[in-house]
Amino acid sequence: MMASSDSAAPLPPAALAAFLRGCERRGAVFAELQCGDTDRGDVALAAALRAFRGNAAALPMADWPVRFWSLLAATPQLRADGAHAHWSGSLAALAAPAPADRAALLLRLAGGLQEAEAAEALGIDGPAYRDALARACPRDATGQPDAAGWRALAEAIQQHLR
């Protein structure tokens, strides 16, 4: 009996479906909060899901998370604020950062990615990612990073995920 060593064998559709189920809600929240518009975020998510489904089988499963998030972050709808962008209440701090910096923050807080994965998804190195994250961090009245503001924003995003 010969064991198959073909690593290019097609992945079972169940593996792809399970992966997408696991990241779809986080992706929807990331997209909405990145552009400040639910409808625009839904369009971006749908485009990223289509693109991901089209090439996932050619990738090792270990590469799927970074590939999915990089496709989503690169959609045109999420690279600039739309005309109807709005962040209110406990999410109002998301209006201040530039879109690229906001993406760094949201990959961490909504996407749940670690630093290295988030940097790779954005196509930047670790120091550039940390700089973007620092720029996106809520600030206090003196312009210093606001730890309480960061915690409040992180909690608001977690509530939004639920």
Where are these regions (language model features)?
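A short, charge-rich alpha-helical start-of-domain segment used by transcription regulators
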Residues: 2-29, 39, 102
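Σ70-family region 2.3-2.4 aromatic/basic alpha-helix that recognizes the −10 promoter
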Residues: 24-32, 42-83, 90-91, 133
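Helix-turn-helix DNA-binding motif, specifically the short coil turn and the N-cap/start of the second
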Residues: 37, 114, 124-128
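Short amphipathic alpha-helical boundary/capping segments
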Residues: 88-98, 120, 125, 140
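Short amphipathic alpha helix immediately N-terminal
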Residues: 96-121
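DNA-recognition helix of helix-turn-helix
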Residues: 122-158
